[in-house]
């Protein structure tokens, strides 16, 4: 979508992919206004470009329209399609039996956890709310956990004390231990990555794995380069 999130997501993807595969060529881009996508026109434009693969960052109702039009017109056939956020229950569930097959996505496969902290969180959430968690539920819970942890470490609600306490703050979460890095206070929470498929009339993630943020975040040297004045 044509706003900061979409622009940043595409820029980051291009940078990372070019670092891994310098000869890759980006042959077309479509920038629909957020929640105002003309999916038919967008799909036609992409099809005319004949890409080998597609990187999609639309979500919500835009994603539903794009998937429907793209499937109807055969856009995704024979093409690897990547969908940022497309495996998150908030966006995958509404697609129901129209969910795409074989997209590589980030998401939250709450239905496949068999044991451990992830399973414990899902069970507790379902018992409390009589519904399954989404990625927003997980992030919200981890945010509260982090606030509690930093207040306990700081021993104060003073802003400076909290700032200092966030450096190398460790938190035990449903996805495992995370740390807020000293250099930028960025958490090392990672992402679940897998492929979409249909199961029981709805979309799910399969062949997924959890990628630790610490394995992918910018190095200290890169962080310093990005800071104004450096």
Could you tell me what each predicted segment is?
Residues 170, 174-230:
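Solvent-exposed, acidic/polar segments of extracytosolic/periplasmic ligand-binding ectodomains
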Residues 134-142, 175-182:
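Short catalytic/ligand-gating loop segments at beta-alpha or beta-beta junctions
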Residues 69-141, 152-157, 205-229:
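Extracellular/periplasmic periplasmic-binding protein-like sensory domains
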Residues 1-73, 111-116, 120:
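Extracellular/periplasmic Venus flytrap/periplasmic-binding protein
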Residues 158-175:
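Short, well-structured alpha-helical segments that form the helix of a local strand-helix-strand
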Residues 1-13, 89-93, 138-144:
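Extracytoplasmic ligand-binding site segments that recognize negatively charged/polar headgroups
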